[in-house]
Amino acid sequence: MNRLSTKLVVAIGIGSALYGILGLWGFSIAPNTFIKPALAILTVFGALFGPVAGLLIGLIGHTVTDTIAGWGIWWGWVISSGIIGFTMGFIQKRVGFSVKNGTYNKGDISYLAITGLIGIVIAIIFAGAFDIIVMGEPFDKIVIQVLGATIADVIVFLVLGLPITIGLAKSNKKHTHLKIEK
């Protein structure tokens, strides 16, 4: 069995705390549905530390948000955050990609964009289905929430998560185009 390194455990703890606290803030766009900039944390930490870290940060962080907010833990949405974090972490497994070393190409960015978008859609549909089947929520309400949450998460991913991750990778490049003059 693979053990989690101390570095990975610390990253999961920090990421979960950030995602959990930042998840308390957002802009309402539908019933119980918000644009939450915290989603960018899942993108960045997933890209830095991989799918397991992304999964655990999503699960733990969302549980923290729901607990602090006092509205009860909505497990379908907690699991959906884990799914999103997990899919954001797929990029870290690509050969040649490293945010830490600043190594990436256009194909890597496209891969992150595609896996991120697919992960968001799958996760939100899962959360909606869970709410209807397990929680007994009305179908009409959930359709609005699923559409709103999907749009909100895609916006945050494309406007914050992806650009921040690319920016971090660019800032960590090990080479420069500057030339040493003799």
UniProtKB/Swiss-Prot annotation:
Membrane as UniProt keyword: yes
Sequence intervals crossing the membrane: 9-29, 40-60, 71-91, 114-134, 142-162
Primary location recorded for the protein, binned into one broad class: membrane
InterPro entries: ECF_substrate-spec-like, UPF0397
One Pfam family matching this protein: ECF-ribofla_trS
Keywords assigned: Cell membrane, Membrane, Transmembrane, Transmembrane helix
Compartments reported by the entry: Cell membrane
Domain of life according to the entry: Bacteria
Membrane topology: Multi-pass membrane protein
GO cellular component, one term: plasma membrane
Membership in a protein family: Belongs to the UPF0397 family.
UniProt xrefs under HAMAP family: UPF0397
Protein name: UPF0397 protein BT9727_2423
Lineage: Bacteria, Bacillati, Bacillota, Bacilli, Bacillales
